[in-house]
Amino acid sequence: MATTLTQSAHASNAGATTQTVALSGVGKGHLLSLVVFTGNGVATASVTDSQGNPWIRNADAYASGSLGVEGWNASGAIGGNTTVTVTLSAASATDFTLVLMEFTGPPTVNAMDQENAN
C-alpha cells in the first residue's frame, strides 16, 4: 500500500512556550507526523495529544541563537479528533511553528526507517 498524505494543519505563535495544532477525524492506525520549527534554537520538551498517542522524536537540528527543527511521529494513531500540544524546554518564550500531518499506508510500528544528518 502506498503512503498517502490524508490531511495537514499548521499553527504559528510569536512569543510562546506552548502551542497546539489539531486534526479532525484522524483514522485509527494512521501515522501522525509533526515538524516543530523554533526560534533561538530552542528544543522541544514534550509532545502530547488529546488521544494519548505516544510521540517519538525522530530527528532534530539546532543552530544556537537561530533556528531549531524537530521531527516527531506517533505510529498507529488511536483515531478521532486529535489536538497536539507542544511545550518548549526554554522558560522564555520564542516564536515557533508546528506542521501536523496524517498519513495512511505506512507501517503502524517502527515507521521511522532511517535518519541522516550532516
What are the language-model segments listed below?
Residues M1-N118:
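Function-critical acidic carboxylates
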